[in-house]
């Protein structure tokens, strides 16, 4: 089960890198940042506008951890979209970390036997499943819809152009449905996910658009398509 815990995975080494990047060699600046870290925790430092650009600049040299990199990328993308929600950023960063491993994106959980390559397979599973597993299938419907539409928008657009698949509105609708149903389930609050899933459902198109920006900048930076040009103009 994916949890909103990316910040909890950050290490002392991650925070030392943040201090290094924000201080830029200034001992006075570093001492000030260390005092702020001790007094307020890491959140204000992770929110620093200049941190994102500096992480991108040193990415190939210092190799920031995936946890630090994804959290900062997602957090800043969400804030740019008008979504100031650290718990949601925690959740989405954890989603990217987990779904990037082997075939995790096709399973509702690491140890689940069924693999779902298509959203219709998840819908079929949802209709046939009861109990606690039904909640996990609901969450996975939201997760998988967001992962596909958030990170691979050009692939979706190309398939739609060839009349081989639906457009992004289909993914938005199913993603909102999955997260919405899951947020109303009794297990949502037990897992500490009620508010996160509710926000993801209510703001799904904006969250997806924020991940489009992460995809454009990090995963497919050299690709130029008509769809990307429209996104750059704010037309989604």
Where does each model-flagged region fall?
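Polar/charged low-complexity regulatory segments
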Residues: 1-235
């Amino acid at each position: 089960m994916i949890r909103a815990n990316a910040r909890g995975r950050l290490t002392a080494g991650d925070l030392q890198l943040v201090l290094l990047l924000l201080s830029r060699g200034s001992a006075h600046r570093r001492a000030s940042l260390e005092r702020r870290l001790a007094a307020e925790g890491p959140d204000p430092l992770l929110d620093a506008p200049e941190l994102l650009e500096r992480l991108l600049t040193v990415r190939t040299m210092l190799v920031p951890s995936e946890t630090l990199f994804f959290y900062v990328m997602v957090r800043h993308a969400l804030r740019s979209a008008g979504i100031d929600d650290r718990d949601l950023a925690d959740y989405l960063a954890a989603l990217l970390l987990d779904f990037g491993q082997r075939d995790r994106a096709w399973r509702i959980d690491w140890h689940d036997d069924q693999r779902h390559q298509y959203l219709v397979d998840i819908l079929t599973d949802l209709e046939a499943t009861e109990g606690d597993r039904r909640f996990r299938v609901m969450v996975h419907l939201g997760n998988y819809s967001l992962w596909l539409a958030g990170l691979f928008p050009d692939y979706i657009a190309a398939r739609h152009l060839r009349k081989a698949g639906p457009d992004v509105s289909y993914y938005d609708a199913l993603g909102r449905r999955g997260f919405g149903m899951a947020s109303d389930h009794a297990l949502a609050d037990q897992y500490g996910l009620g508010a996160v899933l509710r926000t993801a459902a209510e703001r799904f198109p904006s969250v997806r658009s924020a991940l489009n920006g992460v995809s454009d900048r990090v995963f497919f930076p050299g690709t130029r398509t008509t769809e990307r040009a429209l996104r750059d103009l704010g037309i989604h």
